């Protein structure tokens, strides 16, 4: 029996998880890439796609950044001798200059730090894209929805005109 080709495997895509709610609720001014400090069972679970970023956020404590609220469900077979906490806070690996910049903006200007997506880099490293931004008001969300619907309607109209 032949082995599966790694390129055709379902788990070989670079993207692991996306926080779709983040782009709807926040207007990002800057995006950063950060590494994650993970345990072995977490990496195995991430490879199987058992991760949820929807209610997670980043907080800064004692000069370090932590990812909180990210759920990584443990596999039944991967961790029999280790106590697995799916909601534990995970340390983000950022440079000191980036941490200082984030701390200053969060403290002084009221920015929020929210995870946007999690992905594989070079097939071995789990990276997380975090966004630095402010929360949108209700009218901003409505404006974005109107713009998106207008773009879809415009594309449909153009497509119909080209087909005729």
Curated annotation (Swiss-Prot):
Keywords: Cytoplasm, RNA-binding
InterPro entries linked: SmpB (IPR023620), SsrA-bd_prot (IPR000037), SsrA-bd_prot_CS (IPR020081)
Gene3D superfamilies for this protein: 2.40.280.10
GO biological process, one term: trans-translation
Gene Ontology MF term list: RNA binding
Subcellular location: Cytoplasm
Pfam families: SmpB
Record GO cellular component, one term: cytosol
Tree of life domain: Bacteria
PROSITE patterns cross-referenced by the UniProt entry: SSRP (PS01317)
Matches recorded under NCBIfam families: PRK05422.1, smpB
Function recorded in the entry: Required for rescue of stalled ribosomes mediated by trans-translation. Binds to transfer-messenger RNA (tmRNA), required for stable association of tmRNA with ribosomes. tmRNA and SmpB together mimic tRNA shape, replacing the anticodon stem-loop with SmpB. tmRNA is encoded by the ssrA gene; the 2 termini fold to resemble tRNA(Ala) and it encodes a 'tag peptide', a short internal open reading frame. During trans-translation Ala-aminoacylated tmRNA acts like a tRNA, entering the A-site of stalled ribosomes, displacing the stalled mRNA.
PANTHER family registered for this protein in UniProt: SSRA-BINDING PROTEIN, TMRNA-BINDING COMPONENT OF TRANS-TRANSLATION TAGGING COMPLEX
Similarity comment: Belongs to the SmpB family.
Name of this chain's protein: SsrA-binding protein
């Amino acid at each position: 029996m032949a082995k599966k080709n790694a390129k055709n495997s379902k788990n070989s895509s670079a993207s692991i998880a996306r926080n779709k709610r983040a782009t709807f609720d926040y207007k990002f001014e800057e995006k950063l890439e950060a590494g994650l400090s993970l345990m072995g069972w977490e990496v195995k679970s991430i490879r199987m796609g058992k991760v949820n970023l929807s209610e997670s956020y980043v907080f800064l404590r004692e000069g370090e950044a932590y990812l909180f609220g990210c759920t990584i469900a443990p596999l039944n077979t991967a961790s029999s001798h280790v106590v697995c906490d799916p909601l534990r806070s995970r340390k983000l690996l950022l440079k000191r200059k980036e941490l200082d910049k984030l701390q200053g903006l969060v403290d002084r200007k009221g920015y929020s730090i929210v995870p946007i997506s999690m992905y594989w880099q070079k097939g071995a490293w789990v990276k997380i894209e975090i966004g630095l931004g402010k929360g949108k008001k209700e009218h901003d969300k409505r404006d974005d929805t109107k713009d998106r619907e207008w773009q879809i309607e415009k594309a449909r109209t153009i497509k119909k005109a080209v087909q005729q």
